[in-house]
């Protein structure tokens, strides 16, 4: 039996366990309704906290537990949104680290890595949805770089712990700075194994990230196992011909600063973990 009325239809979809619908679905369900009537009904439903505008033509369904918040946690709908937008994605950086239990505090943003051009960042009453464009993802994201995490609404594509750790070094500003990255790495590295990286990793992660992660793991965090794994990767895949870089690419190189020959890094900043009380 066809449901009469947009609100009953929205509630029926919620009862099915759905958390989002599209304008195209509404047009299909109510072909007799004009565009103006559909949008007017959606506006009233939004005012009554039945739905929230997730994107143009993409609406979030708000169960009673989320109605007062006027939104949903991005992790509950990001997979559906990115499929709606037709863009490859993975939850990355601090948001991925949190999923792996390595975030010392809940990130203020939910970070999604995707292809160029990225969607605009979006803020609601709960959190900010931040998109980081990675041009290497323009050709898609290999499954080897992802983990599919099961959630109550389906699955979430998340960068692997190894890709997450390396990406934190590629985008330190988005990740709270190098000292905060160091804090996250203390726990994240416990879930990493760099001895079995996919062959395609070099096409997606700059070699400088391996250098910085290797130095920070071995020389600061004293994780010699991870350090050796990363150094072996550098030797095998670059034949030792990687260039000298600065630890902090945003800071000038100190003329009298320490230089690590093993990692070919000019140590131009002093990193202290946020968890270090000294």
Residue ranges and their predicted role:
Residues 2-88, 190-211, 217-218:
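Short beta-edge/loop segments at beta->alpha junctions of small alpha/beta modules
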Residues 31, 86, 101, 170-173:
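Hydrophobic/aromatic-lined pockets within catalytic cores
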Residues 130-153:
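A short, charged helix-loop
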Residues 26, 96, 165:
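A residue-level signal for conserved active-site and pocket-lining positions in enzyme catalytic cores
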Residues 34-37, 104-106, 173-177:
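Short amphipathic alpha-helical segments with coiled-coil-like heptad repeat character
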Residues 145-278:
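Hydrophobic alpha-helical interaction segments
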Residues 53-64, 71-137:
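Short gly/ser-rich loop at a beta-strand->alpha-helix junction or flexible surface loop bordering the NTP-binding
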């Amino acid at each position: 039996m066809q449901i009469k009325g947009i609100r009953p239809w929205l509630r029926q979809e919620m009862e099915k366990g759905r958390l989002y619908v599209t304008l195209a679905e509404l047009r299909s369900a109510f072909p007799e309704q004009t565009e103006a009537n559909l949008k007017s009904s959606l506006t009233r439903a939004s005012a009554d906290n039945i739905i929230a505008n997730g994107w143009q033509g993409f609406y979030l369904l708000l169960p009673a537990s989320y109605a007062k918040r006027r939104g949903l946690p991005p992790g509950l709908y990001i997979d559906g949104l990115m499929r709606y937008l037709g863009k490859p994605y993975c939850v990355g950086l601090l948001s991925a680290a949190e999923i792996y239990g390595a975030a010392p505090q809940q990130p203020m943003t939910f970070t999604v890595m995707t292809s160029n051009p990225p969607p605009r960042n979006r803020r609601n009453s709960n959190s900010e949805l931040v998109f980081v464009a990675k041009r290497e993802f323009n050709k898609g994201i290999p499954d080897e770089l992802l983990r599919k995490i099961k959630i109550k609404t389906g699955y979430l594509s998340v960068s692997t712990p190894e890709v997450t750790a390396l990406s934190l070094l590629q985008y330190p500003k988005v990740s709270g700075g190098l000292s905060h990255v160091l804090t996250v790495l203390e726990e994240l590295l416990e879930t990493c194994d760099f001895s079995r990286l996919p062959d395609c990793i070099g096409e997606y992660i700059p070699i400088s990230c391996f250098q910085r992660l290797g130095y920070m793991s071995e020389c600061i965090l004293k994780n010699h196992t991870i350090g050796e794994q990363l150094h072996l990767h550098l030797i095998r895949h670059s034949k030792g011909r990687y260039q000298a870089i600065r630890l902090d690419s945003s800071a000038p190189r100190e003329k009298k600063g320490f230089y690590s020959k093993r990692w070919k890094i000019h140590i131009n900043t002093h990193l202290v973990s946020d968890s270090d009380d000294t």
